[in-house]
From Swiss-Prot:
This is Dual-specificity RNA methyltransferase RlmN. S-adenosyl-L-methionine binds at residues 176-177, 208, 230-232, 307. Pfam families: Radical_SAM, RlmN_N. Belongs to the radical SAM superfamily. RlmN family. Its cofactor is [4Fe-4S] cluster. It comes from the Bacteria. Disulfide bonds join 108-350. Reaction proceeds by a ping-pong mechanism involving intermediate methylation of a conserved cysteine residue.
Amino acid sequence: MTSETSVNLLDFDAEGLVAYCGSLGEKPFRAKQLQRWIHQYNAGDFDGMTDLAKSLREKLKGRASIVMPEIASDHVSTDGTRKWLIDVGNGNAVETVFIPEETRGTLCVSSQAGCAVNCRFCSTGKQGFSRNLSTAEIIGQLRMAEFALRASLGRAPGPNGKAERVVTNVVMMGMGEPLLNYNAVVPAMRLMLDDNAYGLSRRRVTLSTSGVVPMMDRLGAELPVALAVSLHAPNDALRDELVPLNKKHPLRELMAACQRYLKVAPRDFITFEYCMLDGVNDTEAHARELLAVTRDVPCKFNLIPFNPFPESGLIRSKPEQIKRFAQVLIDAGVVTTVRKTRGDDIDAACGQLAGAVKDRTRLAERTGAAAKIIEVRAI
């Protein structure tokens, strides 16, 4: 039985767990054993950790715990997308979304309850900011999803044979701005990359930021993973309106930070995300302006059809306009994709990550028609 003041071991990356074991008078290799039990074998208590000395297990039972986030709901979309609503206490909830594809499984992870950036097109921002998530609450989303998915597929973990993982990619693109919760996000990502935990490569962990320039530089120095930048506008005047953070870190400063990041990044390009808003940022002239502002940054574009919500006052760009916009970028030789909408029926699509969902109206009813979303790729 653990005490009310016990340490949650999910809050520790490898270095932190070594230090904690050291405080108990244990050698560093015990931390690796413990980490494998927690993150690879899904151990929920210490008694079953049979290769740990009994004396250590007794110490841990009195001083430590493995506390997972509480699942409030679990929904599966008709397209296979799975969304968990996670209760993080005091009326706050965050969401975790798994997107299955033929060759990979991507988990979208939240970093904050709410968001302070308040992008005009994002329903999460309309909730306002509640608090940062802890490292345990962030890595707990991956642990929860990985083992829930393994269980549904009959892939039981265990020390006698590590099961093939289901989550192959993680994107820090859920609720919140990850770089505004840097001190909790980075240890969680270290665990994602650690071979004694989840063993993902840096190319398979992507952090998405709205452009917190000083923290982009710090991330590049300390833990460069794949980077996506929420751009959404080709000039400062429009981006000031859509992404208020731009007033603090305008496009010239942001593009320079992207160039610096690429010197250490695991990929040789930045992904620029661009939410397609009808009559706001979606003309061919906007596309040409976008090419000009990003010309010195090796990049690819991910165009995101807007997911309407009542408070936004915005409309999704028409499919034919998205195609024309994309073609301008492709003709300039830039790899461009149009994100396929996934999980609309369970409000799991990009921009719909709001714990307190006020409007459960079907997306097709909001947009007037269920538009067929195209995907365009450079050849």
